[in-house]
Structures are given as C-alpha cells and as structure tokens.
Amino acid sequence: RQMCIRDSVYSDVGFILLGMLVEQLAGMPMEAYLQREFYEPMGLEHTGYLPLRRFAKSEIVPSNKDRFLRKETLQGFVHDEASAFFGGLAGNAGLFSTARDVARVYQMLLNGGEIDGQRYLSKETCQLFTTETSKISRRGLGFDKPDADDPKKGNCAPAAPAEVYGHTGFTGTCAWVDPMNELVYVCL
C-alpha cells in the first residue's frame, strides 16, 4: 500500500535532534563545537547561545514579551519554548547574533561554503541546504524558498527569483540570499 502525503508541516524537532547528533559526533557540547569550527574562525564575535554570559543586558535588544511561559519581556534568553526547555541551547533556536555576523554566514553560503579564502562547508552541502527537496514543501534542508506554484504564498516577495533562499526567525527576524543578483539581506 502506497502512502500519499499531500501537505507538509513546519517542525523544529529535526533541528533539535540534529543538535544532539552534532554533540554525539563531535564529542563536545554543540555550542563549543560551533564556536571552534565556525564562530571563532569566521570572526563572528557576537554570535552564540545564552548571550548574557558574555554581554551586558543593555547590549541585547529585548525580543518579545512572553505572556505564556515566563510571563516577562525576554532579553538575552530564547523566545522559542522548546529551546527554552533545553536551557536555551538547542539545535532549533536560541542563537543570538548581530546583522554583521549573520550576513557573514549568509555570504559564506552565497560563496558556496567559503569566505575570506577559508572553506567551512562543501559546495555540495550548500547546494543541498538551499535547493528545494520536496514536491510538497518549498523548503530546502533548513532554508525557505519561493513557492514555484504560487509566488504570492510563502515568505518571499512574488518577484523573487527561484534561486532565493533564507530563513525567518520566531521573533520576526529574517535573512535571505539572492544568488542571481549576489545579494545578502538581513533584518533583525
């Protein structure tokens, strides 16, 4: 009997599990691995989890008023409830950054996995992350894409080229790459 799936549902469970897998394979906490392999060598000075450990509260923009779980304005702590239950350290959410740092990561993706002459990801990995992978979803492996069937649906402008990819955050942030026009857009 063949199963027929007609719709997809966005879920962050896969990224929570991916974070756990990274820890198992790296033999260290995900945060330490990311710091060693990406943040430090890429010069991402303001990127990481639990920013109150490194920065004054006054340097961190309040992200949201949590009326459900913590019942306070969140500043320096993840808004996503699932990540909050993991102490703010999960593969799906909780990463704080600046527009400059996010732009460097997206520029690295636009460059096919390298920046400043240093390779961080293979071209094939970048292609896999940013190419639509399903007929029932407009997503790549982690990135949103324009909806080819109905350009007015989704998070991209209707005139966006099909090659565009990006991601929106839980608190209204977004970052996009337009490979055709060699543009990186970040709004935090």
Model-derived features: positions:
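Short, small/polar residue-rich loop motifs at catalytic or cofactor-binding pockets
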Residues: G169-T171
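Hydrophobic beta-strand positions
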Residues: L21, W176-V177
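Short linear motifs in intrinsically disordered/low-complexity regions
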Residues: K65-R67, P179-E182
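Short, well-ordered beta-strand elements
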Residues: A175, E182-L188
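Short, surface-exposed loop or secondary-structure junction motifs
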Residues: Q2, R6-E163
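Short, surface-exposed charged micro-motifs
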Residues: G142, C174-W176
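Short, structured beta-strand/loop micro-motifs enriched in basic residues and often containing a Trp
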Residues: G166
